[in-house]
């Protein structure tokens, strides 16, 4: 099998890991710690003796904001050319600050420009803090990023609470706000449960894959060693058998020189005077130079398939092979009855001590005409082995990729945003 064919599945596994590594997660942004903000809101409605108070526990300080307490009156931007301005992104954004107010807090809606622009514009008008409410009702506050905004405090709250406060401001009702530092939340790259899940799953997957590969290669090594030993012993047995066969030189008047006599079945040529021939136990005659190499590999008569090892009593009932390095699939084609007979003969032999191939599921050696596996068949067998190994690698890579994506999915609640 070519190196390119073996590298194909391996490249797929590498591509899967590369895709996983480039998966768009928020792990880099989510590694920052953040502080929660505890916000108390006091609403002084006209004609009502007791002010209305409520608390916002889900506020969050900006990443670049000072983590400090602040108190002030809440103000929203003035309309621009008669159009309400809740975003604070327009260069003409203005705030009406009553003369008797020393500290005030700007209330702005998220969107349309960066947090830095909103906060800087409010700071330009001397706000001590900026409260930005989300622009999506189902989203929790995020950690805002706004470098270079100075000492102004920036906090984000939910859309629901922000619009509640805005509704009072639109009615010209005074709203006071106190912002206090809440809990420091450490970086959260992986939830504990996700980390345990990824670790255990990956370890189990690697153990199973490694055990399978180790078992596979051990069996392959055992098979190869047994095959080589049997091949050497078969070769020795064939040489011993050949040495016991009768040879003679064809002389004038011998029956082999008769034109009607069979030609040599190996080279398909007639016998001539002074040719050295080999006589097999089945009485078939061949050129010695032709049949000896054949017998070394096949150990059977080229014509009647007689087993010369068995006929000479060297290895009784031993099936011969022209190539012991056969592929596994061709071995499984013959019947189980012949396999048991062949392996029984191998185990019962005492002259050479040949051992059967220690590979489960191997059937007997096929007939000589089918023994030599074609190049395409060998390539298919080897390709299948590499495909199985590469499949385990690809499966491991995809599983690990899935587990990492699943674990990082819990990071959304800790994201850092710029606008």
UniProtKB/Swiss-Prot annotation:
InterPro entries hit by this protein: PA_dom_sf (IPR046450), PA_domain (IPR003137), RING_finger_E3_ligase (IPR051834), Znf_RING (IPR001841), Znf_RING/FYVE/PHD (IPR013083)
**What is one GO cellular-component annotation here?**
membrane
Catalyzed reactions per annotation: S-ubiquitinyl-[E2 ubiquitin-conjugating enzyme]-L-cysteine + [acceptor protein]-L-lysine = [E2 ubiquitin-conjugating enzyme]-L-cysteine + N(6)-ubiquitinyl-[acceptor protein]-L-lysine
Give expression by tissue.
Answer: Expression is highest in liver, with lesser amounts in the lung, spleen, brain, heart, kidney and testis.
Cross-referenced Pfam families:
PA, zf-RING_2
Q: Which UniProt keywords apply?
A: Apoptosis, Cytoplasm, Glycoprotein, Membrane, Metal-binding, Signal, Transferase, Transmembrane, Transmembrane helix, Ubl conjugation pathway, Zinc, Zinc-finger
Query: What are the boundaries of the RING-type zinc fingers?
Result: 264-305
- List the pathway annotation: Protein modification; protein ubiquitination
Task: Please give the record's induction comment.
Answer: Up-regulated in response to interleukin-3 (IL-3) withdrawal-induced apoptosis of 32Dcl3 cells (derived from bone marrow).
Q: What Gene Ontology molecular function terms does this protein carry?
A: ubiquitin-protein transferase activity; zinc ion binding
The enzyme's first-digit EC class, named in words, is transferase
Q: Where would you say this protein principally sits, based on its record?
A: membrane
Q: Which residues lie on this side of the membrane: Cytoplasmic?
A: 218-419
Known glycosylation sites: 29, 40, 112, 135, 172, 189
Membrane topology, Extracellular segments: 28-194
Per its record, how is this protein called by name?
Answer: E3 ubiquitin-protein ligase RNF130
Q: Which organism is it from?
A: Mus musculus (Mouse)
The gene for this chain is: Rnf130
């Amino acid at each position: 099998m070519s190196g390119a064919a073996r590298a194909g599945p391996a490249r797929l596994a590498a591509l899967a890991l590369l895709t996983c590594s480039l998966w768009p997660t928020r792990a880099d942004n989510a590694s920052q710690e953040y502080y929660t903000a505890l916000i108390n809101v006091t609403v002084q409605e006209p004609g009502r003796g007791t002010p209305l108070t409520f608390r916002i526990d889900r506020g969050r300080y900006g990443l670049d904001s000072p983590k400090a307490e602040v108190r002030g009156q809440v103000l929203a931007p003035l309309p621009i050319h008669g159009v309400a301005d809740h975003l604070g992104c327009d260069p003409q954004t203005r705030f009406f600050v009553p003369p008797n107010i020393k500290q005030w807090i700007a209330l702005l809606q998220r969107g349309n420009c960066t947090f830095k622009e909103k906060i800087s514009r409010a700071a330009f008008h001397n706000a001590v803090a900026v409260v930005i409410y989300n622009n999506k009702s189902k989203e929790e506050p995020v950690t805002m990023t706004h470098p270079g905004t100075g000492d102004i405090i920036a906090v984000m709250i939910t859309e629901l609470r922000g619009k509640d406060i805005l509704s009072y401001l639109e009615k010209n009702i005074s709203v006071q706000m106190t912002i206090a530092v809440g809990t420091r939340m450490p970086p959260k790259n992986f939830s504990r449960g996700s980390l345990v899940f990824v670790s255990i799953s990956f370890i189990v997957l690697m153990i199973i894959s490694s055990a399978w590969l180790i078992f596979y290669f051990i069996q392959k090594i055992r098979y190869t060693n047994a095959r080589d030993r049997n091949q050497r012993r078969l070769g020795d047995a064939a040489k011993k058998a050949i040495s016991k066969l009768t040879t003679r030189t064809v002389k004038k008047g011998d029956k082999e020189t008769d034109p009607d006599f069979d030609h040599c079945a190996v080279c398909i040529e007639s016998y001539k005077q002074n040719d050295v021939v080999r006589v097999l136990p089945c009485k078939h005659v061949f050129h010695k130079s032709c049949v000896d190499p054949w017998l070394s590999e096949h150990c059977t008569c080229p014509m009647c398939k007689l087993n010369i090892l068995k006929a000479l009593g060297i290895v009784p009932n031993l099936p011969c092979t022209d190539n012991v390095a056969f592929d596994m699939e061709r071995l499984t084609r013959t019947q189980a009855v012949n396999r048991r007979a062949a392996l029984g003969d191998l185990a019962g032999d005492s002259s050479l001590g040949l051992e059967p191939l220690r590979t489960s599921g191997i059937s007997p050696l096929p007939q000589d005409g089918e023994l030599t596996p074609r190049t395409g068949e060998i390539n298919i067998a080897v390709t299948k082995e590499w495909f199985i190994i590469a499949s385990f690698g690809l499966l491991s890579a995809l599983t690990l990729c899935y587990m990492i994506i699943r674990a990082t999915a819990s990071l959304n609640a800790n994201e850092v945003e710029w606008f």
